[in-house]
Regions:
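Mobile "lid/hinge" segments at catalytic clefts and subdomain interfaces of large enzymes
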Residues: 1-4, 9, 21, 25-27, ...
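Glycine-/charge-enriched secondary-structure boundary and capping motifs
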Residues: 9-23, 27, 32, 36-52, ...
Length: 238
């Protein structure tokens, strides 16, 4: 944060801490430590608020732990949680559109908790083969990481309720997860999602080695991996 002697900066600090506290209490998330620092500014302009917190989670049975790498060709990939297409404050908006204004994604603590707890039920039942959260970079980034890690591709599709492909694949709406299930488990998985009032989209089908984004756009897993491992070198050489 900037200087706490500035009323606006102090207000940001108070609201951030209160917001984190409200969310942690609702989600029953155990925060064990945290840190902020003040007077981070150039002249009279403070940096963006960046509080840090540390939490603890418990895996009851490590044998049921799920990794993010895609496992098997022809398995089905779903997105848990609804994509509204929120682009403001996203990585895409900042880096591609060069837009830094606009509100962040809406926070819905009920959906956040419900979606997460339902995913845990699916994992505990043994239906999930791989899973990854959707955060910075949106669905396309989460799926790319799963492809690279599992050395598998995917035939992507977007739902009919969102016309804009950019918004669907790059939006950073909260409370979403990408999951992999096999065809035999699909009906059981969707029944549990429906029973718990969790929105989901069928995102695609896993293939051997390419990400098909649409009829005109595809990328190989080797190309994805090269982009992922060489970005820092390319950035530093500019």
């Amino acid at each position: 944060f900037g200087s706490p002697e500035n009323e606006e900066n102090m207000g940001e600090f108070v609201e951030c801490v209160q917001g984190i506290g409200e969310a942690a209490e609702y989600l029953k998330f155990p925060v064990v430590s945290g840190n902020v620092s003040f007077y981070n500014q150039t002249k009279d302009e403070g940096i963006k608020p960046t509080p840090s917190i540390g939490g603890v989670g418990l895996i009851k049975d490590y044998k049921k732990m799920i990794t993010m790498d895609f496992k098997e060709v022809d398995n089905i990939v779903l997105v848990i949680g609804k994509t509204e297409g929120h682009i403001d404050q996203s990585l895409f908006a900042r880096n591609i559109l060069d837009e830094k204004n606009g509100p962040p994604p809406e926070i819905n603590l009920f959906n956040e908790k419900n979606n997460g707890e339902t995913l845990l039920k699916l994992i505990d039942a043994g239906y999930i083969k791989s899973a990854h959260d959707v955060s910075i970079g949106g669905i396309i980034t989460a799926v790319s990481k799963m492809c690279i890690k599992g050395n598998k591709g995917i035939n992507l599709k977007k739902p009919k309720y969102l016309i804009n492909e950019i918004e669907y694949f790059f939006a950073e709406d909260q409370g979403r997860y990408v999951i992999e299930v096999n065809k035999d488990s699909l009906k059981k998985v969707t029944d549990i999602l429906n029973k718990n009032a969790v929105h989901y989209d069928e995102l695609g089908i896993i293939n051997k080695d390419q990400m098909f984004i649409n009829e005109k756009t595809k990328v190989t897993i080797d190309e994805l991996r090269t982009s992922n491992t060489s970005w820092l070198t390319n950035y530093m050489s500019k």
